[in-house]
Amino acid sequence: MGLKISDLIAKEMPLSPEEIEVVNTLIPIKEFKKGQLLLKEGSIARECYFNIKGCVRSYQIINGEERTTQFFVEGDPIASLLSYLNKSPANHYFECIEDSVLAVLRFDDEQKLYNQYPKFEALCRNSIEQEFGKQQEILQNYLTKNPEERYLMLQENRPELLQRVPQYHLATFLGVQPESLSRIRKRIAHRNKP
């Protein structure tokens, strides 16, 4: 794997040779297998990630059942911010649901990077703000739309997930049982028939 994080960052902002060396040292790219957990509930997040290839889901276990709260695909930052910043136990899991390639940044290395090169803080802040906006939209949709409307929004805004993610994970993300998701899909398909 010849890809380096500097290749991706250079698309967003120019990097000096020194900065290239530093970011490639502090932010290694690692491969993770499908099913591998990046974070467990109750542990402290000491790393954040940037998804280069693959799909990661965030989920919680509520009353013994998994509830998916987010899917992270190529180009998405992956962070348990409260745990990472406050050094408090996480209340969720991060699981690779495909073989994944992620850039990995440890908290201490992030601080070194910001202290040495402040321009990276603005880049990371922008990424976090975009992810925060996505989270707000997910919450708003969950509170104001019924499962069929949420499915249609997912179909419109993130259609790749419908092909990549197992139906049972999609169902928990939408807040329904897999059987209900099957009925929703059939209803939509029936309505869309010519």
Language-model features and meaning:
Residues 1-28, 83:
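Cyclic nucleotide-binding regulatory module and flanking cytosolic helices
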Residues 35, 46-57, 74-75:
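Glycine- and acidic-residue-biased ligand/ion/polar-headgroup-sensing regions
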Residues 38-43:
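Short phosphate-coordinating micro-motif centered on Lys-Gly-acidic
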Residues 67-126:
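Cyclic-nucleotide recognition modules
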Residues 145-194:
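Phosphate-/nucleic-acid-contacting segments
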Residues 28, 55-60, 101-102:
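Short beta-strand segments in beta-sandwich/barrel cores
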